[in-house]
Amino acid sequence: LINGILCHGLDFDDTHSAGVIHATTSTFPCALATAGHVNASGKDMLIAYIIGVEAAARLGMVVKGGLHQIGFHPTGVMGSFGCSLVAGRLLGLNEEQLTMAQGIVLSMAAGSLEFLEDGAWTKRMHPGWAAVSGITAAFLAKEGYVGASRPYEGRFGLFNAYLSHPEYNAASDLSLATAGLRETWEIENVAIKPFPACHFTHGCID
C-alpha cells in the first residue's frame, strides 16, 4: 500500500500511453510485497511483475481511454487486475485459481476521478489499493474462495459494467487484450517521464 502510494504521489511513475495507465506503480509494489512474503527469487519476482504490467496495459488498451470519460482511473481499476495476476503467479495459483482471483478483484477494482474536481489526495492511493486488492484476491483464490468466472466479458463484468454507456462500450475491442501475445511485449512500450507531472502536460513543460 505505502510503496504504491509513494510511487504515484511523486508523479514520476512510468506510463503506458496506449493503455493510458501507470502500471508499474501498482504491479511492482505488489510483486515486491508478495515476493518477500513467499521468499521468491528475484527472477520470479520480475517475471510476475512483467505479467502484471502486460495484463494491466493490455486491459487499458481495450478501453482506449474510455474509463477516463466516465470518471474512473485506469491505474486503479486495471492495476487491480494486473496485481491479482502478479500475486497469483508468486503464490503458484493454477489456471482456475487465477481466474477466480481476477473474478474476486472485479469486486474490488476502483479509482474515482472525482479528485480532479477539488484536488483531493485520493489519486495517490489508487495504485496502492490496487496492489492490496490484487494480493487479497490472490490469497482468497488460493484458499478456494469463488469469484466471478467471467470477470471481463460477463453480463456485469468489467467492460459491460464499467463501460455501460453505448458509446464507450462499442469502442472497446477485447481482441486487443491478447493481440500479439508472446510476440509483442507492451512493457517495451512503457515510457519514462522526464518531468514529475501528468504526461499530457509534458509538451507544454518542454
Describe the function of each predicted region.
Residues 38-41, 59, 63, 94, ...:
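Long alpha-helical scaffolds in large eukaryotic adaptor/regulatory proteins
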Residues 32, 64, 85:
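Short glycine-/small-residue-rich flexible loop motifs, especially phosphate/cofactor-binding loops
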Residues 19-25, 45-49, 67-80, 123-127, ...:
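Active-site nucleophile and cofactor-binding loops and adjacent substrate-binding regions
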Residues 7-17, 59-70, 114-120, 181-190:
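Glycine/charged-rich beta-loop-alpha catalytic/anionic-binding loops adjacent to active sites
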Residues 3, 74, 80, 85-206:
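Functionally critical mobile loop/hinge segments
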Residues 51, 55-78, 104-113:
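Flexible glycine-/small-residue-enriched beta->alpha junction loops
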Residues 1-7:
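Extended glycan-interaction surfaces of carbohydrate-active proteins
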Residues 7-61:
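Hydrophobic alpha-helical hairpins/lids featuring a short glycine-rich hinge
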